[in-house]
Amino acid sequence: MPLVVKGKVNINEFIDLSKSEKLLPSMFTPVKSVMVSKVDKIMVHENESLSEVNLLKGVKLIEGGYVWLVGLVVSGEWNLPDNCRGGVSVCMVDKRMERADEATLGSYYTAAAKKRFQFKVVPNYGITTEDAEKNIWQVLVNIKNVKMSAGYCPLSLEFVSVCIVYKNNIKLGLREKVTSVNDGGPMELSEEVVDEFMENVPMSVRLAKFRTKSSKRGPKNNNNLGKGRSGGRPKPKSVDEVEEEFDNLIEDEAETSVADSDSY
């Protein structure tokens, strides 16, 4: 049984259509159609992975048109016994963007002791149909301190999106309900147990490191990480140093005290 049921995705949590937009035919409203995608699923087998995810699965696109990714719901389930240690960070990525901090759309962190979790991300931007057909979205997964033998699947993730498909790039006439988005950067929804770690290593830094490590051509646009700055500011810790601190953090038994209720 899927973790996310299509009928349970509430469009009103992301957008608020006027009465006329709900009643009039599509030809009389700026909105061509509001759609909910089919479920796309990823089985996570590696501690660190960057995988493509189809956020528009089952969505009928318009040739020469646009699609607006209003929001998405991500559900996860740990395939582990109860009270296991460790945790995971999940980050949504737009692979077109070369700067890691601009590529990260939203991220979420949780402990393995919380068997099921669900969160929403509000990207709230549009792309062309041509770009959409290239499957531009990815998910970066980083599992920490989950001791499972290689070849098995500790975590399952499922994705459902709410989007608007339209022909002309005109004002949509929607009042978006956007929550928890900071002007200074992408949205990050955090579990208390890893707040201290994530303040030092945002997911954009992890993405930059993963891209550099995976690329045969070497680093491209992230070669300024870790350089000192003038003005007496302290030199930031390296990613490896903070990751070691995180390993020690999630070893702590207090990790199992994460709230067991699903929340956005």
Curated annotation (Swiss-Prot):
Give a GO biological-process term. transport of virus in host, cell to cell
Compartments in which it is found: Host cytoplasm, Host cytoskeleton; Host cell junction, Host plasmodesma
Recite the UniProt keywords alphabetically. Answer: Host cell junction, Host cytoplasm, Host cytoskeleton, RNA-binding, Transport, Viral movement protein
Where does the record place the region Disordered? Answer: 211-264
Give the domain of life: Viruses
Molecular function (Gene Ontology), one example: RNA binding
Q: Which InterPro entries match?
A: TMV_movement, Viral_movement
Q: Which GO terms describe its cellular component?
A: host cell cytoplasm; host cell plasmodesma; host cytoskeleton
Bias (Acidic residues): 241-255
Report any Pfam family annotated for this entry.
MP
Q: How does it assemble?
A: Binds to host RBCS at the plasmodesmata; this interaction seems required for viral systemic movement. In resistant plants, interacts with host MBP2C at host microtubules; this interaction prevents virus cell to cell movement. In resistant plants, interacts with host resistance (R) protein (e.g. tomato ToMV resistance protein TM-2(2), AC Q71BG9) at the host plasma membrane; this interaction triggers host defense responses leading to programmed cell death.
The role this protein plays is: Transports viral genome to neighboring plant cells directly through plasmosdesmata, without any budding. The movement protein allows efficient cell to cell propagation, by bypassing the host cell wall barrier. Forms a ribonucleoprotein complex with viral RNA. Binds microtubules and modulates microtubule stability. Can bind double-stranded DNA. Triggers host hypersensitive defense reaction in incompatible plants harboring resistance (R) proteins.
Q: What's this protein's family per the entry?
A: Belongs to the tobamovirus movement protein family.
Tell me what this protein is called.
Movement protein
UniProt source species: Tomato mosaic virus (strain LIIa)
